[in-house]
């Protein structure tokens, strides 16, 4: 057993309890009533960073939730890694679908079950404990800075300004992020690309009050009916987006990419069974893995209006609402797409309702060059921990701040994540396997043993 494995084995119970201390804080950025929890979680992270060996760790205020900054400087001449993560989590609703309380972590069947077990408290803890392991074994070959934000799940609205203000403080050679997933438990991988994101809220208003559906139905437009028609028309029967100009900057999947994607082990039957669907759906001419990584998509994330309580109430509602998003591919500008969407809705909305579109958060896609020295270091580190050389894969999720880091700080990012699809992030019963938790720590420690990370 290597010294790294021995250190992890000797300290694994403490590592788990420290993670649990974070999970028990419901740091939900989407809900204002959890503002005190955001502050408490940030403070707890400073304590854990200092205990892990950071020279300093402080809570720094922003226009929104605070940022946690920490650092360990081994030498002015050494190269520097900036570790990014987030301490906020998604809301846990619907609670009735959880098999255990979301903020009371449990270990069952070799997994940690709780909100944030994977995204991203679990993966952030892998980073910090990997750093601690390398430091205590005298293996740390580079300076390490940490920046943990509290607004990733709401689009990082305060982080760009923070980065611009503290550009010198955040100076580094590469950014390391653990907030992505691997292909499967049997197939380790490194993420080489992410999709971008554009997100909107839509409000449709008809009459000035809820109306009796018998007295007014058929004579007055129903806002829910109108909203459903507007949203349904955004995609065709195959899921292709119909907004004019939407695909102008979309590059088709290249033959080389298609060949690389085809090498990824993928069992369609297992995929369908895991998510409980009989058939898959999507743009014609593309495989499932191409659709959910290299092609854009449109989704209604929430839609509501009218009477939703127990029993029946025959009303024609005054208002209807939706939250919708587009996943974008590299070269699609989220600002341009947002404008196209707003102009499209304004053009097709009927005169008998008022439609208001409010753009929310968004960001660009990102592609990591696989010839970066830091990528090679991550590849070797994962190989040591998992016993298999990781595949290079593009993923369908979004971390909009990654492209901002490159634009503002001028630093490339390496995405070394340890999640799995079955971990159910953003869903009830989120979890993380203990095996991956420890292998993630080992991978990070192995990464820090490799001094050549400068681009």
Question: Which residues does each predicted region cover?
Answer:
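N-terminal helical capping/dimerization or prosegment-like subdomains
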Residues: 2-95, 319, 336
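An extended, acidic, His-containing surface patch that forms the Zn2+-binding/catalytic region
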Residues: 51, 184-185, 242-319, 330-343, ...
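Acidic/histidine-rich catalytic neighborhood of metal-dependent amide-processing enzymes
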Residues: 118-193, 455
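Flexible glycine/proline-rich, aromatic-decorated loop/lid segments
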Residues: 189-205, 414-416
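A short core secondary-structure module
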Residues: 217-238
């Amino acid at each position: 057993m290597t010294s790294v494995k021995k250190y992890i084995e000797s300290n694994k119970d403490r590592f788990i309890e420290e993670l649990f201390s974070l999970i028990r804080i419901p740091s939900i950025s989407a809900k204002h009533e959890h503002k005190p929890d955001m502050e408490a979680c940030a403070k707890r992270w400073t304590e854990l960073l200092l205990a892990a060996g950071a020279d300093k760790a402080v809570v720094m205020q922003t226009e929104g939730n605070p940022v946690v900054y920490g650092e360990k400087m081994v030498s002015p001449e050494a190269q520097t890694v900036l570790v990014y993560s987030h301490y906020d989590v998604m809301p846990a609703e619907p609670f009735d679908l959880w098999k255990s309380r979301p903020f009371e972590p449990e270990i069952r069947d070799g997994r940690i079950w709780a909100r944030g077990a994977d995204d991203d408290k679990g993966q952030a803890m892998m980073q910090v404990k990997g750093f601690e392991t390398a430091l205590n074994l005298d293996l740390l070959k580079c300076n390490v800075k940490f920046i943990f934000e509290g607004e990733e799940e709401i689009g990082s609205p305060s982080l760009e300004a923070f980065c611009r203000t503290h550009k010198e403080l955040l100076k580094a050679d590469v950014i390391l992020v653990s907030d992505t997933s691997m292909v499967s438990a049997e197939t380790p991988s490194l993420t080489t690309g992410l999709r971008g994101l554009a997100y909107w809220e839509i409000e449709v208003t008809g009459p000035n009050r809820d109306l009796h559906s018998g007295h007014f139905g058929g004579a007055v437009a129903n806002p829910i009916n109108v909203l459903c028609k507007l949203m349904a028309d955004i995609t065709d029967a195959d899921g292709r987006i119909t907004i004019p100009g939407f695909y102008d900057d979309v590059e088709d999947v290249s033959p080389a990419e298609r060949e690389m994607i085809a090498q990824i082990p993928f069992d369609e039957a297992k995929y369908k069974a895991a998510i409980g669907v009989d058939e898959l759906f999507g743009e014609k001419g593309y495989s499932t893995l191409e659709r959910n990584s290299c092609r854009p998509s449109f989704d209604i994330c929430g839609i509501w209006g009218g009477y939703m309580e127990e029993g029946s109430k025959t009303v024609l509602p005054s208002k209807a609402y939706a939250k919708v998003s587009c996943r974008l591919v590299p070269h699609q500008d989220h600002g341009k797409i947002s404008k196209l969407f707003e102009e499209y809705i304004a053009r097709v909305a009927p005169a008998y309702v008022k439609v208001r579109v409010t753009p929310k958060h968004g960001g660009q896609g990102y592609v990591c060059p696989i010839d970066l020295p830091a990528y090679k270091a991550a590849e070797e580190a994962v190989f040591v921990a998992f016993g298999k050389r990781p595949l290079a894969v593009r993923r369908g999720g979004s971390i909009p701040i990654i492209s901002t880091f490159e634009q503002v700080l001028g630093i490339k990012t390496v995405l070394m994540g340890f999640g799995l699809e079955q971990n159910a992030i953003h869903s009830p019963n989120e979890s993380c396997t203990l095996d991956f938790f420890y292998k993630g720590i080992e991978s990070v420690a192995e990464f820090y043993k490799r001094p050549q990370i400068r681009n």
